[in-house]
A protein has these predicted regions:
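One-carbon transfer enzymes
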Residues: 1-133
Length: 133
């Protein structure tokens, strides 16, 4: 087992790029968890991550906080859980699973610009500032 173990959770275009980079880095990506197409029906930029997961284990979920999903993630004994492109708020059982913590990101300034397609909304709303949280 590698010295550093990670799990990735997400399912948007940005998630695919990050999973590809993690696979290429050979830095201990144990598993990729992606929302099922049904669970991600509100994401127009949904990407099924299986083609990007390489040799990492791949799982699809309906609810990232469901006890069964959290148990599957815990089986990989992750040091870090990366979270990009998830529309659910992670609850305490999942947050407590990795030994180091969860690292997430959103391509907008939160909480004001939460939700899908924040770059498009920033342009549409004429925002003069945009960022990453």
């Amino acid at each position: 087992m590698p010295d550093f173990r990670s799990v990735f959770v997400g399912g948007i275009r940005l998630s695919a790029a990050i999973v590809s980079a993690l696979v290429d880095s050979d830095e201990g990506l144990q598993a990729v968890f992606c929302p099922s197409p049904e669970a991600a029906s509100n994401h127009d930029d949904y990407v099924r991550l299986k083609p990007y997961a390489g040799d990492s284990n791949y799982h699809e979920y309906e609810d990232i906080n469901a006890p069964g999903t959290v148990e599957k993630i815990a089986q990989y004994e992750p040091d870090v859980v990366y979270v990009i492109g998830v529309s659910q708020i992670l609850k305490r059982p999942l947050l407590d699973t990795p030994t180091v913590g969860c690292l997430g990101g959103h391509i907008a300034l939160l909480p004001a610009n939460r939700g899908c397609n924040p770059i498009i909304w920033a342009i549409a709303n004429g925002l003069s500032q945009h960022g990453v949280t």
